[in-house]
Each structure stands twice: as structure tokens, then as C-alpha cells.
């Protein structure tokens, strides 16, 4: 594996070894799905209308932009990906794609997505998309991830852009409504990632990545609970602009209360984190975001 990684890192692996599936994996498709859904939410709740074709173009641009950010992330982090068990099967450390190919893929997708968004949709959404790619690829991946245990807190800004981009695709503006969804994702991100980081902290130690659990497990548990409570408050803010606020608040409160219950289970543990508690929170946090945004869509119309 080490020899293969060194070979691919220097860009000497034959391009013929790369398949379509390898490039799809390079773009982090699971994250892309969540990004696309939150962007579509922004479109659906925005005032006004958008031509279906333009809406489709905007959605594809957001997906490609997210893929570009993922490619840049794997390009830059290929050294630590090769060390961690959770990531050593990714295309670059596995020898399926070389670093130069990943860089080129990221550049092509980033340029194409922003350019098409500017020409076909509007300049506001294009600038926001460019900002999102830059935030994840440069601010989080290159500047924060290896330098501070608060990396995922500040880096969460990148993942919070999509609903704002979706809103701007329709209206060409920013708004408190779209910023409300931005805030939800921003606050949701730390407990979501810290839950899985608690289970993989030894790998982060080995890779010398200063995730918060590496420094203090107890502090991480406290922060998870704190952010979960803040999320419940922020998650209630769409009730200020939806058409059916009472229904929204009832459903959002139920979802947030369950989130807090999972966070409490993690917080109450002593010693080493358990798979049951941490994975329970991690998996539910994904359902939470999908369901909460679905409730926003349902209660706006």
C-alpha cells in the first residue's frame, strides 16, 4: 500500500487504472446528496419562480461545485487519508487516481460550475458557489483542519452555503430566511462530525490531525451537548417565516428533542466512547437535517 501511495502521489499511476466509479468516489457523493438537497430546499422556499431548466442547471452546478470541493479535499489530504483506516480506501491512497488527476478534476469542476452558474442563473449564486468551494477547499482543508481543534466549527461555514445558493438562484438576493437555514447547518455540523470523530480519535492522533476529541474526550462530549441545545433554538427560527408556524414548531421541537436525547447519551458516557452512542447520534443527525428541511418545505407552502 505504501509503495502504491508513493507512486500515485507522484502522479505516475496510469490513467487507465481510473474508472468512472473512482472519480465518483473522489467527489464524495454522500456529502453531495446532502448539499444538493439543502440547495433545493433554498430554491423551493424562495419567493418568486424559476424556470425548471434553470433550476436544474443550478442544482447540477451546486452538485459539481460540491464535487470539486471534495476532489480538492482528497487531493490535499491524500497523505493523511493513507494513514487512517477510515479513509485509506479512497481513490488516491488506494492507487486508483493520482493526485494530479484529482487536482485537475477539481479545477475543471470548480471552473465549470461557477462559470455556468454565472451565465445561466445569476452572478450572486455564482459568487456564493465560488465562496463555498473556496471555504471548504482552502479555508477548512488547507488552513484549519491540521492547525486547530476548532477546525470543524469554522469549517462548517462551507457546508452551510447551499440553501443560500439555492435561494439566490431564484431571487438573486440574500435574505434572513436563507440565512436561517445557513445557521441551522452551521450549528449542526460540529456535533455531527464530533460524534464520528470520537470513534476514530486514535486514527486522527496517528495522522496528527487536531480534532477536538484528540485533545479532550470530555470536552468534546460537553460541546456536543451544547451545540445540540443551540441547534434546537436555531432550528426553531424558520417558524418565523413559514406559512404554518405552529405545525412547524411542533415537528421541529420533536426532531430537536430527539437530537438532544442522543447527545445526552453521548455526554453521559464515561471513559472511552461507545459505538452505540456515537453512531446513534451520527446517524440520527443525518436524518434530522433531511427531515427538518423537509418540514420547512412542507410548512412554507
Curated annotation (Swiss-Prot):
Q: In which pathway does it act?
A: Porphyrin-containing compound metabolism; heme O biosynthesis; heme O from protoheme: step 1/1
The membrane-topology field of this record reads: Multi-pass membrane protein
What is the designated name of this protein? Protoheme IX farnesyltransferase
Q: Under which EC number(s) is this enzyme classified? A: 2.5.1.141
Q: What does this protein do?
A: Converts heme B (protoheme IX) to heme O by substitution of the vinyl group on carbon 2 of heme B porphyrin ring with a hydroxyethyl farnesyl side group.
Q: Which InterPro entries match?
A: Protohaem_IX_farnesylTrfase, UbiA_prenyltransferase, UbiA_prenylTrfase_CS, UbiA_sf
Q: What else is known?
A: Carbon 2 of the heme B porphyrin ring is defined according to the Fischer nomenclature.
Q: Where in the cell is it found?
A: Cell inner membrane
Taxonomic source organism: Anaplasma marginale (strain Florida)
Q: Which GO terms describe its cellular component?
A: plasma membrane
Q: Where are the transmembrane segments?
A: 34-54, 55-75, 102-121, 125-144, 152-172, 181-201, 222-242, 247-267, 280-300
**Would the keyword Amino-acid biosynthesis turn up in this protein's UniProt record?**
no
Amino acid at each position: 500500500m505504501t509503495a502504491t501511495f508513493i507512486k500515485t502521489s507522484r502522479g505516475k499511476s496510469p490513467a487507465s487504472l481510473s474508472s468512472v466509479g473512482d472519480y465518483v468516489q473522489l467527489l464524495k457523493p454522500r456529502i453531495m446528496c446532502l448539499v444538493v438537497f439543502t440547495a433545493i430546499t433554498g430554491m423551493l422556499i424562495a419567493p418568486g419562480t424559476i424556470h425548471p431548466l434553470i433550476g436544474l442547471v443550478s442544482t447540477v452546478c451546486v452538485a459539481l461545485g460540491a464535487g470539486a470541493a471534495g476532489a480538492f479535499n482528497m487531493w490535499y489530504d491524500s497523505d493523511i487519508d493513507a494513514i487512517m483506516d477510515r479513509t485509506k480506501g479512497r481513490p488516491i491512497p488506494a492507487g486508483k487516481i493520482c493526485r494530479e488527476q484529482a487536482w485537475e478534476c477539481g479545477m475543471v469542476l470548480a471552473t465549470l460550475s461557477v462559470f455556468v452558474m454565472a451565465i445561466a442563473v445569476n452572478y450572486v449564486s455564482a459568487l456564493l458557489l465560488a465562496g463555498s468551494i473556496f471555504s471548504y477547499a482552502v479555508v477548512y482543508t488547507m488552513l484549519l483542519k491540521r492547525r486547530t481543534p476548532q477546525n470543524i466549527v469554522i469549517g462548517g461555514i462551507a457546508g452551510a452555503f447551499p440553501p443560500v445558493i439555492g435561494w439566490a438562484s431564484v431571487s438573486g438576493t440574500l435574505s434572513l430566511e436563507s440565512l436561517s437555514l445557513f445557521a441551522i447547518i452551521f450549528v449542526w455540523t460540529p456535533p455531527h462530525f464530533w460524534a464520528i470523530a470520537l470513534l476514530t480519535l486514535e486514527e486522527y492522533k496517528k495522522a496528527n490531525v487536531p480534532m477536538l476529541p484528540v485533545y479532550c474526550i470530555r470536552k468534546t462530549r460537553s460541546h456536543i451537548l451544547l451545540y445540540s441545545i443551540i441547534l434546537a433554538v436555531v432550528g426553531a427560527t424558520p417558524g418565523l417565516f413559514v406559512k404554518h408556524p405552529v405545525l412547524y414548531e411542533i415537528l421541529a421541537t420533536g426532531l430537536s428533542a430527539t437530537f438532544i436525547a442522543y447527545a445526552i447519551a453521548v455526554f453521559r458516557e464515561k471513559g472511552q466512547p461507545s459505538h452505540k452512542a456515537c453512531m446513534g447520534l451520527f446517524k440520527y443527525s443525518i436524518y434530522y437535517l433531511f427531515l427538518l428541511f423537509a418540514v420547512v418545505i412542507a410548512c412554507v407552502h
